[in-house]
């Protein structure tokens, strides 16, 4: 998932994406703990996707505050 794709989404869509990614992260952590996870790199990819979504949300919040001031 690219940051440019995320910037085109609304805040509501980004929040939904964040919830979905958090659920995926939890699932991957449980699979890792029970040694059922084959692709260990997925944990890092999901973590970076969460960071991207949170960064775009912060950008949008900052832009909204700047336009109101």
From Swiss-Prot:
UniProt organism field: Methylobacillus flagellatus (strain ATCC 51484 / DSM 6875 / VKM B-1610 / KT)
Gene behind the chain: rpmC
Cysteine disulfide links: none
InterPro entries: Ribosomal_protein_uL29, Ribosomal_uL29, Ribosomal_uL29_sf
Name of the molecule in the record: Large ribosomal subunit protein uL29
PANTHER family (alphabetical): 60S RIBOSOMAL PROTEIN L35/50S RIBOSOMAL PROTEIN L29, LARGE RIBOSOMAL SUBUNIT PROTEIN UL29C
Keyword Ribonucleoprotein attached: yes
GO CC annotations, alphabetized: cytosolic large ribosomal subunit
Signal peptide from the UniProt entry: none
Keywords, sorted A to Z: Ribonucleoprotein, Ribosomal protein
Example GO BP: translation
Sequence similarity: Belongs to the universal ribosomal protein uL29 family.
GO MF entry, a single one: structural constituent of ribosome
Coiled coil: none
